């Protein structure tokens, strides 16, 4: 049986990498739409701006409404993508934000870059977006044809994330290990 590795096209990890974000995305396009929460922008906005100051790419910021829903995806597409001429989608935040960025990129056929700010989910690297209703109830899985073009893990940002979320990420990784072993044993 063949073994296949499915992963992002490029994975970048290290301290201070958000300060180089603009340089990393230059090859994907010239105008990036950065999806981020307002509180996230207060924490890392200066690093993102510095990364684009040293780049030929420019950025526009869209504040995420905290729910990965079809309504939110449509809002972002209508207000920012269709009217803003962006050619790259960047999601900076947690799992729901990453899933929203991937869904927006999928529906608009744009490259996507995911920069997690917590290490508690596998959403940044997966070819899947989980969509919810506006009330936070599960709606659907959106299976994507490819993984993100770039996943950038700024370890300075991750090191400052809440401990409970890091512990949750460790638990998720351990569970994934046992899930993979069970799948392999069953021949799935």
Please provide the spans of the model-predicted regions.
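Glycine-/small-residue-rich active-site loops that bind phosphorylated ligands and cofactors
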Residues: 40, 67-69, 96, 119, ...
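Short glycine/serine/threonine-biased micro-segments
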Residues: 12, 89-93, 167-169
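A short, small-residue-rich loop immediately preceding and capping a beta-strand
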Residues: 80-118
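Short, conserved catalytic/metal-binding motifs centered on acidic residues
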Residues: 14, 95, 174
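ATP/NTP phosphate-donor binding region
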Residues: 1-88
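Short glycine/serine/threonine-rich phosphate/pyrophosphate-binding segments
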Residues: 18-21, 41-45, 96-103, 121-125
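A glycine/threonine-rich phosphate-anchoring loop and its flanking beta-alpha core
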Residues: 107-188
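Redox-cofactor binding/interface segments in oxidoreductases and associated redox assembly factors
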Residues: 34, 91, 153
């Amino acid at each position: 049986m063949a073994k296949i590795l499915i992963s992002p096209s490029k994975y970048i990890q290290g301290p201070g990498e958000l300060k180089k974000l603009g340089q990393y995305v230059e090859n994907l396009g010239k105008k990036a739409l950065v999806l981020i929460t307002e509180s996230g922008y207060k924490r890392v906005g200066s690093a993102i701006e510095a990364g684009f100051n040293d780049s030929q790419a420019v950025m526009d910021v869209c504040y995420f409404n905290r729910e990965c829903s079809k309504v939110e995806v449509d809002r972002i597409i209508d207000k920012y993508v269709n009217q803003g001429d962006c050619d790259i989608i960047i999601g900076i935040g947690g799992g729901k934000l990453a899933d929203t960025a991937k869904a927006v990129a999928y529906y608009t056929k744009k490259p996507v870059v995911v920069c997690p700010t917590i290490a508690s989910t596998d959403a940044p690297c997966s070819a899947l977006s989980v969509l919810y209703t506006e009330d936070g109830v599960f709606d659907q899985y959106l299976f994507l044809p490819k993984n993100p073009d770039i996943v950038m893990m700024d370890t300075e940002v991750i090191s400052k994330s809440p401990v409970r979320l890091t512990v949750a990420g460790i638990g998720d990784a351990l569970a994934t290990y046992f899930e993979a072993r069970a799948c392999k044993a069953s021949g799935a």
